[in-house]
Curated annotation (Swiss-Prot):
The lineage of its organism: Eukaryota, Metazoa, Ecdysozoa, Arthropoda, Chelicerata. GO terms for cellular component: extracellular region; host cell postsynaptic membrane. It comes from Cyriopagopus hainanus. One of its GO terms (molecular function) is toxin activity. Keywords: Disulfide bond, Neurotoxin, Postsynaptic neurotoxin, Secreted, Signal, Toxin. Expressed by the venom gland. It is found in: Secreted. This is U4-theraphotoxin-Hhn1a. Disulfide bonds join C52-C66, C56-C77, C71-C82. Residues 23-48 form a propeptide. Neurotoxin active on both insects and mammals.
């Protein structure tokens, strides 16, 4: 009787874990379909990095303290680079 109960509980736990993992994979796949492709995201990241570093270099050449350009959309300028906040 105890063995049967343990087997049933084990199967139920495995089923719950499997269902949770399947839901997470499905959510990830939907996010990937809705979002931009990785190549476009990489291009956006490179543009942000370039804009921020160029802005700081221009200000340094003018004998002024580097006041970092504000990066938009959840990005922050640190060490002449835009980084995600």
């Amino acid at each position: 009787m105890k063995v049967t109960l343990i087997a049933i509980l084990t199967c139920a736990a495995v089923l719950v874990l499997h269902t949770t993992a399947a839901e997470e994979l499905e959510a990830e796949s939907q996010l990937m379909e809705v979002g931009m492709p990785d190549t476009e995201l990489a291009a956006v990241d490179e543009e942000r990095l370039f804009e921020c570093s160029v802005s700081c270099e221009i200000e340094k050449e003018g004998n002024k303290d580097c006041k970092k350009k504000k990066c938009k959309g959840g990005w922050k300028c640190k060490f002449n680079m835009c980084v995600k906040v």
